[in-house]
Every structure is written in C-alpha cells, then in structure tokens.
Design a protein with these regions (language model features):
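HIT superfamily nucleotide-processing domains
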Residues: 1-120
Length: 120
C-alpha cells in the first residue's frame, strides 16, 4: 500500500484532529487517499478507524466522493481487516452528533476480534 499523500492545499484543515492524524499519525496501513489508525478508545479487541484524506465532515456528505473513491475506501476496509486477521468484523459509521459522532471528519470504524455487543 502506498503512503498517504502529502497535504494538498486547504483540503486538510489544521484544526481537525483526523486531518492531523492523516498527515502525521501512526498509520496501521495506508493507500492512495485513505489511512487506517487504531482507535485510542477501543470498543473491541481490534478497533480501527479508516480516514479519508479529503476533509468531509460526516457521512451526510458521502456524495462528495466519486463512486470509484467510495469503492476504494470499502476495498481498503476489507484489506485492512484481512491484514489484521479479522474474519468477522463490523464496519460502523456514526453520522452526526445524535448518532455519537464526536469528530467531524468522515471516518469508518472497523471493530472485530471478539463479541462487541449485539446489533441487528
């Protein structure tokens, strides 16, 4: 996998924690436009965050991604999960404060490595 791209203009605000982690974080994996990091407050034995390079506040703005970017992001989720040895896992998106989103930079949670609670 390729290293994350260097900062591109104003697409990565200085005041966004996830933009900073995209640029400077301890990445588990990286590919063009996306990185994976470990969640600092894990809710499962393995709890990773998939961060896009592009600063998009939440899943509500997913339409700003092309179909190809969205596909690459989901393929990256599967690659990272496999690399971590996960065969059974959850992919979760919190879209907005009422859903539990606390950092307003689109990100996907990948949780696995043990039962993480029942979800229908």
């Amino acid at each position: 996998m390729a290293p994350p791209s260097p900062r591109r203009g104003s697409s990565l605000p200085d005041d966004c924690l996830f933009c900073t982690l995209y640029r400077e974080g301890d990445h588990v994996a990286a590919t063009e436009g996306f990185v994976a990091i470990r969640d600092i407050h894990p809710q499962a034995a393995t709890h990773l965050l998939i961060l896009p390079e592009r600063h998009v506040p939440s899943f509500h703005e997913i339409g700003q991604f092309s179909a190809d970017e969205t596909k690459r992001m989901l393929e990256f989720v599967a690659e990272v999960a496999a690399r971590e040895g996960l065969t059974d896992y959850r992919v979760v998106v919190n879209a907005g404060p009422g859903a539990g989103q606390t950092i307003f930079h689109l990100h996907l949670h990948v949780l696995g490595g043990g039962l993480t609670g029942r979800m229908a």
